[in-house]
Amino acid sequence: MEAIKDSSHLYEVERRAYHVERPGFRIAELQISPTQNVPWHYHNNVQDTFYVLEGSLRLFLRDPKEEVRLAPGQTYSVRPGRTHLVTNSGQTSATYLVLQGIGEYDYVPLT
């Protein structure tokens, strides 16, 4: 698949806000319902660091296969090139920050 610079049109979330956006680094806040997810994808250049504010997240990762559950206050980083899927593992909305950098942002969706 081809890398995309803006992935906001590819999947629905309850809310998306950017708190910091500068060359090579950004901080986004996302809120997803229990039925929403961020589909399988990877980034060529940036690491994703997730920080849960409310609710709970479940991350599925490949290479190697791994499953991570995060509660409020917990973090997890996904290295560039590692495929991952982000889901809400709770019964209410989940809100989290994702710190993305250092490098040029891209999003490579998988089918």
Feature locations, PLM:
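Short, conserved beta-strand element in jelly-roll/cupin
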Residues: 32-33, 44-59, 101
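Short acidic-glycine-tyrosine-enriched beta hairpin
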Residues: 64-80
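Ligand-binding loop in jelly-roll beta-barrel domains
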Residues: 80-106
